[in-house]
Amino acid sequence: MSDVDAPESPFPALFNFRDVGGYAAGDGRTVRRGRLYRSDSLHRIDETDRSAFTALGIRTVIDLRRPSEVERDGRVPDYDGLTYRHIHPEHADWGANRFDDSGVSLARYLADRYADLARTGTAGLAEAVGLIADSANAPVVVHCVAGKDRTGIVCALTLSVLGVPDEDVVADYALSTAASRRFTAWVRSTLPDAEEPPPPFLESPAETMELFLTELRAGYGSVEGYLTHAGVTDAQLESLRTHLLD
């Protein structure tokens, strides 16, 4: 496993912001740092965060939230030189399939939700990966609400197609559990009357991503096969490897 740990976020109001780089790929190269970041919702950063955000050189923000979530909470500040792309991979409202009513483990529940998103959100996922593949957009930050589910899928697909071993892809995904707990602690301290988040929001079991990747490959032959099915071109896949691997 690559020696990559979850760093402290440079932004006080973000809890799952981190560099996706640093992982070893199967061909001896390494995923470049400072090119792709993942995060929970960026609407909580403000003018006091401008210098830290600018220091990262971020050019593009990919927001995977539902339109209603963007309308409710707002978006990343409109910093100079920043391109904002709202891409919502279509998927069912999880409220219609509550974990408490599912009768399965949390890992199985989440993996099923991810599989549903991979089936219905192909266009959005392909668009997001295509944007990441274009070096002119880098550095890129991809985020959703908690930065673990929709963002976790996009980052897992990206790392996998770069040749990062499943062990590391799964470990990167599982880092979001600690981030969710930090967020929950912050909510308790700042909004004591807020409702406790449900288990699917708080946990990122490693088994979830193991199941998702295994079953995706069973259906499409490989992660690359899935991305091609979704609409990512061979040229985009080659570009992804060219600029994200050292």
Enumerate the language-model features and the residues they cover.
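Ser/Thr-glycine-rich phosphate-binding loops at phosphate-binding pockets of nucleotides
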Residues: A146, R150-T151
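Cys-dependent protein tyrosine phosphatase-like superfamily
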Residues: M1-V141, I153-D246
